Amino acid sequence: MERSAPVQASLWSARMVEWSLMAGVILVLALVFARKLQVVQGQGELAAVQSTLGALRTALVLEHLQKSTVGQGSSVAGTQRNPFELLDRMPANYRGEITRASASSAPPGSWLFDKDCVCVGYVPLYPKWFDSPSGNTVAWYRVSGAPGPLQLLAEEAYVWQDQALN
């Protein structure tokens, strides 16, 4: 009987080492998964931003083409208005007309329009992926263009996860 006690103690300590290693491996895998999930969320937001910018640009071109077929093509450059009004459906995260000064109070993930500068702005949902040369926390796109269709031009060289956001 004296020998069974040390064998049980060594089995118990070996079992604890196994479970500790298993818990460590699971913890490392969970941390790697959480990191990859954040990257994918950032990529999803980038895709949504690019899609909305594409829809706005397309709406501006279609408006120009429509006005040129009616014969109002020369006055298109003077009608710089909110491009969100040209969309069939407003984005769910569009917050309306907000000035640059109060843009920081908009909730993350919001689109906005500043009628004073005729600019479209986006407040990132995950700002850790967004980089602005000036350190601005909002991506601004100026509505401009003459002659021809109005365009959305990035005010800075924005970068999102090492990709140009223009």
List where the protein language model places each region.
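N-terminal single-pass transmembrane signal-anchor helix
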Residues: 1-41
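Intrinsically disordered, low-complexity regions enriched in Ser/Pro/Gly/Gln/His and often acidic
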Residues: 12, 103-106, 153
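Membrane-proximal N-terminal amphipathic helix
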Residues: 43-69
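Extracellular/periplasmic head regions of type IV pilus-like filament subunits
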Residues: 64-126
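Short, surface-exposed interaction loops/tails
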Residues: 119-166
